[in-house]
Amino acid sequence: IFLNPSDVGGRYAALTFVGLVPAALMGLEFEKLLDYAEEMLETCQPDVPWEYNPAAWLSEYIAERFFLGQDKLTIMADPLLRPYALWIEQLVAESLGKEFTGVIPIVGETPGSPTVYGPDRIFVYLGLRGRQDLYRRLFADLKEAGFPLRPYWLEDRYEIGAECIRWELAVALCGVWLGVNPFDEPDVIFSKKKTKEVLETFKQTGEFPVEFYLDDDLQIGFLYAGGLKVQYPRLRAVVKKFLYETPPWGYFAFLPFLPYDEEIEEIFTDLRTLMRGRRQCSTILGFGPRYLHSTGQLFKGGPRTGRFLIFTRKGRVAEQEIPGWGFTFWDLEFAQAYGDFQALGERERPVLHIHFTENYKEDLRKFYRFMEEITRLSDEEE
């Protein structure tokens, strides 16, 4: 039994038993991770002059640009380090996204030419020495276009231990700059409360308290909330409203509560690239329910610049029941999705809930083609 310190929040627990025990079970040299971490910690002490303090430098880079209106922290990573970038996404979003402010981390986008990025972007690259050629041309193009870019080169992947220290301290210091508490997550509980209410209704009635509109063309269900108003509840009209009312400094968040596989992620990655290319807006992809404890705090507590698209599917007859709870895993997942839809709507965050049939992959492909058409027509109308 490993007893973890109770006063360390999940996103700051990477170098506690939470991260080290799994690393040891995988056969990794966790002592090497800690050696790198200790070296970084020594250089980030309060008595180290600012210009020699790696965490202070990173904090200043993020905060200074934030106050210049560049709040989209775009994190690009060597393919071997991409899972680590997801941890940074949670660290930044959950620590700084509250009280109607926050730095918005953008992770996992397909790299593009400078013309597809808005002026609200700054860039960080996480790379491995010996593999610098992967993004050399992109770096040159971004710098030539005037985008702030800061690369961090790791000697090997064990140096992630040092980077955990750098980022944890830098983000905590950013909280001071932004005037928020980087160690709480006051809005996460709101979605949990809504989910619980949805499940209670389901257990009492056997039905979810939701009735979707049906799009005649695509034959998929949809709901909308968060201040979105259209004369007739048609999916085309709602999506157009999404597009027209999204400011250039806004962002789109695609939030699928769908069975994960590479094909699904690839389609959503294409959707992100499409929206970025047509609207020059930043995009986020968060699979549910994971994102609820990652970027979910930012979505409900951060700046009101996001547009949110939640995706669910119809449950199958033979879904696995959770023993002793009276509902299935699908029921729980749907309640989490609909609960977050309600939470976003009540916080006046424009949100669209798309509900697919059991053939959700084909429905998703149809939805992509629909978005391709609607964004093209919107561009022509403008």
Briefly describe each language-model feature range.
Residues 3-8, 95-110, 148-160, 278-290, ...:
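A generic structural motif
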Residues 271-301:
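Amphipathic alpha-helical packing elements
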Residues 1-124, 129-133, 169-281:
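Active-site phosphate/pyrophosphate-binding segments
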Residues 289-325:
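Conserved, well-ordered active-site substructure
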Residues 142, 152-154, 326-340:
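Low-complexity, glycine/alanine/valine/leucine- and proline-rich hydrophobic stretches
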Residues 184, 189, 204-210, 217, ...:
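C-terminal amphipathic alpha-helical interaction region
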Residues 129-146, 150-153:
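Phosphate/diphosphate-binding loops
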Residues 176-185, 313-323, 327-330, 337, ...:
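Ligand-binding clefts of soluble mixed alpha/beta catalytic domains
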